[in-house]
Amino acid sequence: MQQQAIVVDAGDPSTFKEPPKSCALTCPVSGCAENGAPYVCPALAAWDSLPHESTCADWDGGAPAVEATKCTATAASGDAVKYAGPDPDDATKVILPDGRRVTPAGSISYFREMDLEGGEAYSLLPVPSSNWILVVDAGYGVHAVLAVDRTKIGTSSDPVASYVKYPAPKTLNSAAVLVGTSTVLVASDDGVVEALDFDATKGTLTEDDAKSIPLPESVDDNNNKANWYVSGLALSPDGSKLVVTSVFDKRLLVLDATQAGWGKQLGSATLPNAPTQQAAFDPNDATGHFVYVTEQGDRKLLEVDVSNAAAPAVTRSWGTDKNPWGIAFLDARWIAVANDFGDTLTLVDRTANSATAVPVDSAVTLHGEEPTALAFDAPSHMLWTTLAGANAVAAWTVDTSQTPPALSPAGRLPTPWWPTGVAVLPDGSVAISNMRGPSSGTDPTQYPIGSGNPDRGPMFGGMQIVAKPSAADLSAGAAAVATNDQVGALAGAPTVTCPHGENDFPLPPTNTQGPSKHIDHVFFIVRENKTFDALLGDFKGANGAPSLTMKASTVDMDKLWLDFRKAGRQFAISDNYYTSAEVSVQGHVWTVFGRSFDFDERAWFLTGYGGRQVYDNPASQPQGIIPTGRPAEGSVFDWMAANHVEYDVYSEGLGLISAPMVNGHNPVHLDVPGGPTQGQIGYPDVERACYEAAHVRVFCDVGNFVYALLPNDHTEGVGMSTPSPEAMVAVNDDATGIFLDAVSHSPIWKSSLVVITEDDPADGGDHVENHRTPVLFVSPWVKHGYVSKQHVDVSSVHKIFAHVFGIPYPNEIVANAALPLDLFTSTPDYTPFTHEPRQWPLSCGVEPSVNLAEGALSASWGDVDDVDEQPGLGDQVWRAMRGLPATAVTPTMQRQMDESARLVRGRVHVNHVK
C-alpha cells in the first residue's frame, strides 16, 4: 500500500484541506510504502513554494533582529524546587503532585490493606455509643466496607478491625445507614441495597445477603435497562421506613425497614430529575413526615412527604447552586445544603419557604474549593463541610436567632488529599475521611493504577481524627490551609527583574498587566500515558533514572522518540512537572479544565476502569460532558471564548459541549483526521499533524490558542492485528516533529509558544513520584537547552495561558498554581525546529501462536478506542519495549484478563440487570 498521493496545486490552497492518507498503522505492514520511506506532509514544503490564503502574512522566511535582554528571571530554589513526596525538611509534611502541601491536623491513619488495592474512602458512618466508625471504601480496585477503631487512628496499630470485600463488578456508593444496632445498609450499583451484620463488641463486619434488599429494574445513563444505582439512603427516625434514591432513575422508593416487612416496597414518587446525591430525614422531627433530597439535575433541594408510604409525593423544592451535595439540619426550621460546583452553601427556610446562598469563602470569587459533605454539631452550634478541592474542612459558628442564620467563619482544618466525609463525635472531636491519602510515592518498574502495595504505586484513602478543636486550632488551621494551597507563593519561586526599567519579559509576571508583548499564539499538544523517566530519564541535567526509560539504551530512545527528544534538547523541559491523573479520563479533565473536581475523582473508575462500567455511554465519559460533570467555570474553551481569545480544538472529547465561537471563528474541526473527539487511538497521528500544519502554513487561520491531541503513543498493546507499541510511538513522534516544524517555519513562530505533555503517567515507572510526566516548552522565548527545576503541574500550564493572554484565572486551583517564569527569556532565539522523519521501522504485534501469553491478554480487550479500558496495557507496553514478553500468563495477567471480560460483558449490559 502506497501513501495516498493527494494532488496539491501550488496555486490552490484548498487542495491542502485533506492530508495524504497514511498506511503506517495498517497491519500487515508489508505492503505499506511508509515502511521504507517516511510519511511526507506537503504542508511542510518551503514557504515560498506553497499557496497561501489571504489570511497569511507576508513572510520572507527570516526572523526579526534579536534585541538585547532587558529583563531576567531567577532560577527557582528552596521550597519551590522540592519534588513530590515527603518534604525532606519536614517529616510531618507531604508535597502533592500539584505542589500543594499536606499537613493533616490531629491523628491520621491510611488504609493499607494489601487486598484492597485502589481503595478510596468515600464516606464515614459513626456507630452510636461506640468507638467504631464504618467506612465505605470504593475506587479502582476492590470495594469494601470497613470497621475502623477510632482509638487506633494515628497509632502503630491497624485501626481496621474487619472489612467485607466487594470485588468488581460489584460497585458501592457512598451512602450508608445503620438499622438498629447491628444491620448496616450500603448503596450499590448491584440492583440491591447491600446488607452487612456488625458486631459492635468485636468490630466484626460480615456480609448478610439474606438482608440485602432487591430493588426494581432501573436504567443507566443511556436509559437502557440496568440495575438500580443507589445514591441516597435515609432511615426514618422511628426506623420503620427506608428511602432510596438513584443516580440515573427519577424514582424515589419507600421500603419497609421493619423486621416483619423487611425490604418490601411500600411506594414510590417520581422526582423532577436525576441524579440525586443525598437523602436525609430531619432529626428534629420525630415523626419522619418528610425526607429531603439533593437533586443535582435541576439544582434543587426537594421535600418529599412520606407520611403515607404508599403514596409519597414531592411537596416543595428550593433552588440551590450547582451540584447540591450534603444536607445538614440546623433546627426544625433551617436546612443547610452544600453546593459542590457552586462553592456555596444554601440556607433553606422551611417556614418562609425561601432559600439564601452563602459563599464558602467571601474573599474568594473563583471556583474550586468544592464543599461536599456537611455535619452540624448542635451543642457547639458549629457547621462543618469538607472542602474537597482545598484539602480541608471548614467550620462556621451558627446563630439561628437571626434570619437567615448568621454563619461566622470559625476557621479550617487541613486534611490529607481529597476529603470526602466529616462527622462530629459525641466528645466534640472531628472525624474526616479522605480518598487520595498522602499521594502515591515512587514506582521502581511500571505504575499499576490500583496497587495497594506501599512500595509500588499505592493509591489509598484514610481516616483523620482531630480532638475537639479550639478557636485557636481553627484559626491556625485556616492559616495552614492557605499556606498549603498557595503553591505560587512558595519561597524560592522565580522572580523577574528589569534593571533598565522597561519590562519586556515575554511571560508577564501577573495576568492583570495586559497580554504578553512577545507571545500571542499558544499551542497545547496532549499526547498519551508516559512518566518522566519513561521518556526522559536519561536526559543530561535532569533528575532522571536511566534504568526506567522505555527502551534500555539511549540510542534506541533517541531513535524511537527522535523528534520529541531532539526538541527537548533544543528547547526547554521541566523535570519537576506532574499531572494528578492516574488514567486518561482524569488526565483529559486536567488538560481541559486545569483542575480536577469531586465528580471526576468519584466517577472516573465507573467508566470501565477496574471492571466497573456504570457510566456506559460509549460516545463519551461523563466527566466534562454531562451537565453535572462540568464545573461551573467551564472548560479552557469556555474560558478562552469568555475572554475573546480565538481558539481551535483539533480533537478532544471533553469540554466541546459548549465550545462557543469567537468573532465568528469556528473552533471545532469536524474534518480533522481521526475525528474531532478523543477516539480512534489507532488513526495515524501524522495525518492529524499534517492537517494542522496546513492550517498553520497554508490557510493561516489558527486561533491564538490551539488545543490538539496526538494520541498514538497510547498504543494498542501487542496483538496480532494491531501495530506494535514501537510503531505507534514512532508515528506519534513523527507527528510531533511535523507539528513543531510547521509552527517554527511560519510567520507566527516569532510569537508562538508550544507546550507538549502527556495526559497521564500510566506507562512506565518513575523514581521520583508516579505522577511525574514529561512537559516540553518550544518557543523563541524559552531558554534553549534548559531544564527547569521548579515544581509545576498542569494547572501551572493553564496559568501560563492566563498570563500570556492577560485574562482572569478560570478557577482557584490555577490562580494558586506555580508559574515557571524561569523557563522564559527576554532574549529570543528564533532558531526553528527541523523535523527529522521517522527512522524506526514499522511493525505489527505478535500472533497469539507466537506468544500465547501476550496474545491472550491483548485478545481479552474490547474496543481499544475505549481509552484506557485495557487492563494490563501499560505493563504489556513496558514488557514489549524492553523485549521481555511474558512467557506464560502470570496471576497478575489473569486478573487483568478477568477484568477485561467483566468490561466486555458490561458494555452489552449482561452484568447490569439481575
Regions found by a protein language model. Give the residues of each.
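Intrinsically disordered, low-complexity proline-rich regions
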Residues: 18-19, 635
